[in-house]
Design a protein with these regions (language model features):
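Membrane-proximal envelope and lipid/glycan-remodeling enzymes
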Residues: 2-486
């Protein structure tokens, strides 16, 4: 999530209404249940596809003291045009260099170095690294834990009278609706990068949210808050090294910085600068390291290797970043209709759409967010017509929800921009933050007008509760169904 203005926890119940009995155990239990389902999908369905072990191969290279993956097949060096998809087909398939980046006679992973660096200790200690499906599973579970922590913070600081089941339902939505559960069930190298990006962005956001309780205030001892902000900033920077699209999370840092400046008051300039450095400094430092690594490998601080990939088409001539790609890709990410199957569970991912890439829009197996995560619709319906009243009583929460929604939406735009093809794993970059924003909107609006019954929700809130629970059940069922092998 993002920055919030410091405020005491808001009680939204009438004085004569008994507080709901707290069963806080239901929240970690829900998170644990999500992780168990992730593990089941990873063990029963996931596959470590041949040619997708580029993270492990890069980690092994770093452990040996270099960045490039060795050896380079002699056949690749002798090709007149090593990037031509027809000429390099046999080498790509037979010599296990599919989707690696090739520049100046060296092979590299076409990804950032965050995951390989995390794997280096395993390489040094055991001479090997976990398979991609394990990396994906562990990272996804860490992301769910961080999302649960974020939602618990929201309740403690702003909506302290929320029943525990509502927070648990929000955790279930983030974990089981949308693409992340499906990503775990695939568990290849690209999915590992997506899952690590999810884990790091959620953890960074949670740390930043926690830091805002006193960061920028007049409290004389803010060292712990600065440490949390610095850790969150660094973790968001590392997320960029896992998924370059996560650079958009700099929006969260900008919101935090704005809050710090807004709270300045009579504080000395040196104190303000120290707070701002804690928020932005680590992200910038990590970003510089990423840029240097990119420049060393690919000659440009912004090139992660996609422009040099040995792929099913020539990436050196691929027309990247066309406006014409946005609309069809976004339509797929949001509204791709699931495919039909003749037996239980009767639905599956929409099949691959092929074509003459890149002139024709293509798609990997897909399902749109409105089908796999209909709680997003409930969150939007809750937030848009609610007016200012609910947010005026919890301005910090409104800031956080807006920052999460904006960042998630921009992530969907960013993944729709480079290539004329859509993929479910691309959707997973922005969906978690959108789900957090939807949950925040639901929890805020449903708590705005309590009843004397002690349910913590007004009449409109109870309707929202029913809508959320129905949408949650549908989203979980659909997301589970599309994982069943055909």
């Amino acid at each position: 999530m993002a920055a919030t203005v410091a405020a005491a926890p808001r009680s939204n119940q009438d004085p004569g209404v008994a507080s709901p009995r707290h069963r806080t155990w239901v929240i970690p239990l829900t998170a644990a249940a999500v992780m168990v389902l992730y593990a089941a999908s990873a063990v029963l369905v996931a596959r470590d596809q041949s040619g997708s072990d580029f993270h492990r191969r890069t980690a092994a290279a770093i452990a040996e003291g270099h960045l490039d993956i060795r050896p380079v097949p002699a056949e690749l060096r002798t090709l007149p045009d090593p990037y031509d998809a027809g000429s390099n087909l046999d080498v790509r398939v037979d010599r296990d260099v599919q989707d690696l980046a090739y520049r100046n006679g060296r092979l590299y992973s076409a990804h950032g170095l965050t995951i390989p660096l995390l794997l280096v200790p395993s390489e040094l200690a055991f001479g090997t690294s976990p398979p991609n499906w394990v990396i994906t599973l562990v990272a996804a579970c860490a992301g769910v834990a961080a999302a649960a922590w974020t939602l618990v913070q929201i309740r403690r600081r702003f909506l302290c009278d929320l029943p525990d089941w509502t927070t648990a339902a929000a955790v279930a939505a983030v974990g089981l609706c949308g693409p992340m559960w499906v990503v775990v069930s695939v568990g290849n190298g690209y999915e590992a990068a997506v899952a690590v990006g999810f884990a790091l962005s959620m953890t960074g956001a949670a740390l930043l949210l926690r830091s805002t309780e006193r960061l920028g205030s007049t409290d004389p001892d803010r060292s712990l808050e600065r440490a949390r902000a610095a850790a969150g900033s660094a973790v968001l920077g590392l997320a960029v090294g896992a998924r370059p699209t996560m650079v958009v999370t700099a929006i969260l840092l900008a919101v935090i910085a704005a809050v710090v400046v807004a709270r300045r008051g009579s504080r000395p300039t040196a104190s303000l600068i120290a707070d701002l450095l804690a928020v932005a400094g680590p992200f910038v430092v990590v970003g510089i390291c990423i840029a240097v690594a990119n420049a060393v490998r690919f000659g440009s601080p912004t090139e992660f290797g996609f422009g040099f990939q040995l792929s099913v088409w020539d990436m050196t001539t691929y027309p990247q970043g066309r406006l014409s790609y946005l609309a069809p890709n976004l339509l797929d990410h949001l509204a791709a209709i699931p495919g039909h199957r003749s037996s239980f569970p009767w639905i599956t991912l929409r099949p691959t759409i092929g074509g003459d890439r890149p002139s024709v829009h293509t798609s990997e197996p897909m399902i749109g967010l409105i089908f796999s995560a209909p709680v997003l619709v409930v969150g939007a319906v809750a937030a848009l017509p609610s007016g200012r009243a609910p947010w005026a009583r919890a301005r910090g929460l409104g800031t956080a929800v807006a920052a999460a929604a904006t960042t998630g939406a921009l992530l969907l735009v960013l993944v729709s921009w480079p290539f004329n093809t859509s993929s479910l794993r691309y959707t997973a970059d922005g969906a978690p933050l959108l789900l957090l924003a939807a949950a925040g909107a639901w929890l805020t609006v449903r708590s705005d007008a309590p009843l004397a019954s002690g349910t913590g929700a007004g009449t409109g809130g109870r309707r929202l509760d029913r809508a959320w629970l129905v949408a949650l059940a549908v989203g979980i069922a659909v997301t589970a169904a599309v994982q069943v092998p055909t």
